Design a protein with these regions (language model features):
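Short alpha-helical segments enriched in small residues
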Residues: 2, 6, 12-146
């Protein structure tokens, strides 16, 4: 079975996912890299997300989540990568992406595509949205390797 030799990119969770992963015993054997690319500039500079993608679709979108995770998987030796971008609140929501809207990207090394998912977490509490986002990302990774 594939290891989690992975990379994680988070926007709305601010590092919570890697914090949860590093609580696991033996994590150095499967955890490689974690990036918090909170700003659009860092998404562009570190992950290679195109400015046009962000300007056309927004930082919180399927397209940006996919570009983020494809950038991660191409720049690392990880077997699996996940991206999270969303609106954790309490402000920043829009009609299209209200507070609680989160997009996830997941990619497996040597596959030429990534899957994206959109989730809406109805609790408007920032901490709850972040926690639920991190847990959903863990579930995505687990499902991808089993």
């Amino acid at each position: 079975s594939r290891g989690l030799g992975d990379v994680y990119k988070r926007q709305c969770t601010g590092g919570l996912l890697s914090s949860l992963i590093t609580e696991l015993p033996g994590c150095p054997s499967f955890f490689e890299t974690s990036l918090v690319t909170y700003s659009n500039k860092s998404k562009i500079d570190f992950l290679g997300v195109k400015k046009k993608t962000i300007s056309q679709y927004g930082a919180v979108s399927h397209q940006t989540a996919k570009a983020m995770v494809m950038g991660l998987i191409s720049k690392t030796k990880s077997d699996i990568a996940v991206s999270i971008t969303g609106v954790a609140g309490p402000t920043g929501g829009t009609k299209k992406n209200p507070v609680g809207t989160v997009y996830f990207g997941i990619a497996i090394k040597n596959k030429n595509n990534a899957k994206t998912y959109k989730k809406y977490f109805s609790k408007k509490n920032r901490k709850s949205i972040q926690s639920n986002s991190a847990k959903f990302a863990i579930d995505l990774m687990y499902e991808s390797i089993t």
